[in-house]
Amino acid sequence: LPRLGQVALDALLYLNFLQLPPLQLVARWPVLYYGLPLVLMGVLAYISRDPLGLGIVFAGHLVTFYCIGTAIGLALRRIGGTPLTIWHIFWLGGITPWLLTAGIMWWGRRRALRLCTTKYSLTTRKNLPNGRLTIVQVSDVHPRACAAMDHTRIPELKAKIEACRPDLLVLTGDIFDEFTEPEELDAFCKLFGELDAPLGKYYVLGNHDLFHHWREPSFGRADLERGFAAAGVRILEDTSVLLPCGVRVVGRKDYLYTNGSRFTAAQLMPGGPDDHYTVWLDHEPRDFKNAAAAGADLILSGHTHGGQVWPAGAVGMVAKNERNYGRKNIAEHCDAIVSGGTGTWGYKFRTQGRTEIVCAEITTEREN
């Protein structure tokens, strides 16, 4: 079935390419007229060979626009007359899909590079230091030159984090990946060391930080631990920390590093809910209800990139995660926030979600 679908898409593209206006100039030479569309398809196949390259994004959007246009054209054929004529003029012999794709690529790049600060205001009945707590979440940085975040943008990222004046800084995984060069790792570890967070800095591993999905990374676990230790960042793996101010931070191992058999939420907090405000860090947005039942007050996750490329990213992430992006109320006392990522995965392109840091401001409710 996948092969038949691919053949059908190839045929659709070929027939549409035959309608391109420039080809009409060589219509009297069959070899050129029927051969040039094949060359164009070969070019698209070539630039799409890298699953992490922009070529596959470009080709995917182009094919999508051609499919939509063909479906509309076939529907209008049944009607005929003026609507069909107007459609042919609008479609301009197949040029419109190229213009739409170019527009999407331009907009997606701008959206990916725009670093936002997304603020959430929450309340709790539990006591907080001075009645308030500000948490900044950095997630899914994936630093590399061809992605949205690399060392050249560290000053901008640092300024946005410092503007929030965080009490607590949390890093929810995929801060690095298998494409991260040692220079990038050192630069970002230095950044985290320069940031001030009076209640501490905590980090949980993501599925890319140490796992080799695409290639052998240029750094190992020892390099990661050494860099974070120098920066004053504590790594949490199925561990909880009770801070002197009474706030608890729980960090979970990612599913990938436990073969799906990590500690349960109840095992991490065997005493269940208590009077300590509990910040729950889990790279992948799963198991929300069990975390809330165990005593989590605020769950912070990443991983999804908010979908990043619509609709493929949204469909893929929704299938495995309980939330794709944003805030979700889990229980009366518990909320979850899923970051869209402080960087992008693979390329400087985003049509869904935001490139962001999350600033969660929690205040203690006053009793009436």
What is the meaning of each model-derived region?
Residues A75-T96, L100-C164:
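N-terminal signal-anchor transmembrane helix
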Residues N127-N368:
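Soluble catalytic domains of enzymes that build or remodel membrane lipids, polysaccharides, and related
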Residues L1-L113:
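Non-catalytic terminal accessory segments
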